[in-house]
Amino acid sequence: GVILVAGAAVVKFLTAGLVYSAKDLKSTCNLPVLGTLASAAARKAVKLDAKLNKLEGRPDGSRDDETVRLIAATIASRAPKADRILVTGDLPAEQLSALTAQLQAADTLRSRKLTCAESVLVSSTAVLEVNAADAVVLVADCSCSRYSSVNDQKEQIARLGKTVLGCVVYE
């Protein structure tokens, strides 16, 4: 019985097409990963789940502040002349806003204007923001983002004449 339940869970996960890891997202969507941050679930994980996350090399939240500074420095070095940077993805607005605020607070991006917007696949405002941006950063969360959605966003941004600097992944 346990094997059937586990097997059904694996099949459901695979058919849902959810992003599994930053490494898989990089290879599947051909997107550079700017950094990985702990998802809400990873921060709450205890005992066996926390141990499994550690074995898989997933972040636990203890280094998120340093990782955000590293992501900000990477963005600044990849787009040295970008004054206006858009952070976008198919995440809840609060999560996008919080990440944008953290990046904006980093020394390397403090002098630049960072904005956030919903996915370009569902928001006309996001399309306008992409057009106004000098650089675009995608954000994905393993708990809700799908490979197809991330890839479609990347392609839509390219059709709008912009390139995606990379992706921040919540694991």
Spans of model-derived segments:
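Short gly/ser/thr-rich secondary-structure transition/capping motifs
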Residues: 117-121
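Short boundary/hinge segments that flank catalytic cores
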Residues: 1-112, 127, 141-171
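Inter-motif core of Ras-like GTPase G domains
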Residues: 123-142
